Amino acid sequence: MTMTDPIADFLTRLRNANTAYHDEVKLPHSKIKANIAEILKREGYISDFRTEDAEVGKTLIVDLKYGPSRERSLAGVRRVSKPGLRVYAKSTNLPKVLGGLGVAIISTSSGLLTDRQAANQGVGGEVLAYVW
């Protein structure tokens, strides 16, 4: 069966594993999921990610990050632009997540960027998700 929204599936698996205090999440690999994981690692929401060859295709393994007393570093995730309703933002009207404490992941012509990177480069695009 085909997956309608692989980005939402990725974010949901991350949220569920984080809520259950799992140390890692295994999910099907794709370039966009690896790019989102790279942004989450750079912003400090996950500790690391890697790709492994599976029997069929590749597997993306994301290592979740917790504080010293197991407090979650990933408080929340929300999918914004969906296959049925795409959400775009101009470079002058980029969203702020929790007044700048969170991160908006935006798909631009320059690749996947955070809201701050897109504002610095002066590009807009499709708002994929909010992470805080």
UniProtKB/Swiss-Prot annotation:
GO BP field = translation
The question of whether RNA-binding is a record keyword is answered with yes
| Species this protein is from | Rhodococcus erythropolis (strain PR4 / NBRC 100887)
What HAMAP family has UniProt attached to this entry? Answer: Ribosomal_uS8_B
Biological role stated in the UniProt entry: One of the primary rRNA binding proteins, it binds directly to 16S rRNA central domain where it helps coordinate assembly of the platform of the 30S subunit.
Q: What does the annotation say about its assembly with partners?
A: Part of the 30S ribosomal subunit. Contacts proteins S5 and S12.
UniProtKB keywords: Ribonucleoprotein, Ribosomal protein, RNA-binding, rRNA-binding
- Establish whether keyword Membrane is in the entry: no
What SUPFAM superfamilies is this protein classified in?
Ribosomal protein S8
The entry's protein name is Small ribosomal subunit protein uS8
Q: Name one Pfam family in it.
A: Ribosomal_S8
| A single Gene Ontology CC term | ribosome
Output one GO MF annotation.
Answer: structural constituent of ribosome
Recorded name of the encoding gene: rpsH
The set of disulfide-linked cysteines is none
InterPro entries documented for this protein: Ribosomal_uS8, Ribosomal_uS8_CS, Ribosomal_uS8_sf
Looking at the record's lineage, which domain of life comes first? Bacteria
What is stated as this protein's family in its record? Belongs to the universal ribosomal protein uS8 family.
